[in-house]
Design a protein with these regions (language model features):
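Structural alpha-beta junctions
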Residues: 12, 80, 116-120
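Alpha-helix boundary/capping detector
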Residues: 34, 114-115, 123
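Short, flexible loop segments at boundaries between secondary-structure elements
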Residues: 118-129
Length: 129
């Protein structure tokens, strides 16, 4: 990783940012969690909501018919973050984006993708006001 961070052009990138994460999520290391999740999801009913949801497993708007499968596949699939932002921007064209969660790295990635829009970062109770 240090090599890639020092040589981002080896990936065809401008720069490489290491994200601090709590686990090896979205990798084959956690694939064993797929079956228990699938079993649990098969026990519940999921109906269509009123708010569109986009998943980073395929970056597209979720259909109820594929939601459970997408949730299971998201465990060990790559995150299509930039594509997800592009689809939301194209489909919905929101005036305001809210980034909810710790840190600012992904908020910065969103900001660069939608630089002409408002972005509110909520990473604490205080910042939600």
């Amino acid at each position: 990783m240090n090599y890639l961070k020092s040589n981002p052009k080896a990936l065809g990138a401008k720069r490489v940012i290491l994200l601090e994460v709590a686990g090896a999520f979205h990798t084959e290391i956690v694939s064993s969690a797929k079956k228990p999740l699938e079993d649990t999801l098969n026990e519940i009913d999921i109906s269509k909501g009123n708010i569109p949801v986009y998943m980073n497993v395929d970056a597209k708007k979720v259909e109820v018919s594929t939601l459970k499968e997408n949730l299971v596949n998201q465990i060990d699939s790559s995150v299509l973050f930039n594509q997800q932002i592009e689809y939301v921007n194209k489909d919905i064209d929101p005036d305001l984006w809210c980034h909810i969660g710790p840190g600012n790295v992904t908020a910065g990635m969103v900001r660069k993708s939608i630089s002409y829009k408002d972005l509110k970062v909520i990473n604490s109770l205080e910042s939600s006001k």
